[in-house]
Amino acid sequence: MPRFLVAALYKFAPLDADGKLQADLKSACEHHNVFGTLLLAPEGINGTIAGPSAGVHVILAELRALPGFDTLEHKESHADTQPFLRMKVRLKREIVTMGVTDIDPVDDVGTYVEPEDWNDLISAPDVVTIDTRNDYEVRIGQFEGAINPHTVSFREFPDWFRQFRETRPDARIAMYCTGGIRCEKATAFARMEGVDDVFHLKGGILKYLETVPEAQSRWRGECFVFDRRVAVKHGLELGSHTLCHACREPLGPEDLRSPDHVVGVSCPHCVEGRTPEQRERYAERHRQEEMARARGEWHLGQPGAVRETDG
């Protein structure tokens, strides 16, 4: 039976995000052997944590005890090994960085659509489905027929969306992301831009994969996650992807068979952009990682939380 409970969580609500709260939460997590990342900002909390089930639920209870966070929701999955190397609690300006002011992800967002109703929505001929995630995430899995904005970061989404709206000004829009948080902001932004018919998948891809039977699913591929599992598939089972330790791109079976893939050094996505000196440095880091693994230790240079959690 899996030893670790993984909880992905977020909530938009006013928060007094200060150093004391940061220190208190980190201390509580470490006391209960809970690792992961929590982002604190004036607009709310976002993160993923993992550890013994009892410890994770203690931390969730502490978060829900904060004023305005009693309705914080989380999504659970499980892992046989700890998917994080350490606990990080960070103070940020935004819990998911879009860089747009004046949007209201608390009170003015799109219409939530339950996972069991999602297929009907995105099958409608007048609905355009948009993946709000970044290109490296979309590459390994997405919903059938969804548009990939090819963004490198979520900051690029507003400009892309404005250009898209010029070509489809009257479209009904369905948006989705990993756990729901980016869609809160993306649909709030769409509302600010004057879009009335905008919908988003409640609980994100993770809730859909947990809820909808694979035989009925419109999802194709795997879902990138922001921890050492790299990707999950239907039923939130561990996926087949791993990471390139040089560029942190997700690698599937075909990537691993490529002659450009050298474990710890390069992959098809970064081989052309690395100097001989960089490759030597990556090779030495990989050697240190293997030595640490042989001793039953973690080498802190290993990719842990792949990128800061976007949700």
UniProtKB/Swiss-Prot annotation:
Record's keyword terms, sorted: Oxidoreductase, tRNA processing
Entry's Gene Ontology BP terms: tRNA modification
Catalytic activity, as annotated: uridine(34) in tRNA + AH2 + O2 = 5-hydroxyuridine(34) in tRNA + A + H2O
Residue segments, region Disordered: 277-311
Basic and acidic residues composition bias: residue spans: 277-298
Active-site residues annotated for this sequence: 177
Rhodanese domain residues: 123-217
Gene3D superfamilies attached to this UniProt entry: 3.30.70.100, Rhodanese-like domain (3.40.250.10)
SMART domains: RHOD (SM00450)
Pfam families: Rhodanese, UPF0176_N
Gene Ontology molecular function: oxidoreductase activity, acting on paired donors, with incorporation or reduction of molecular oxygen
HAMAP family hit by this protein: TrhO
PANTHER family according to UniProt: RHODANESE-LIKE DOMAIN-CONTAINING PROTEIN 7-RELATED, THIOSULFATE SULFURTRANSFERASE/RHODANESE-LIKE DOMAIN-CONTAINING PROTEIN 2
Protein name (record): tRNA uridine(34) hydroxylase
Organism: Maricaulis maris (strain MCS10) (Caulobacter maris)
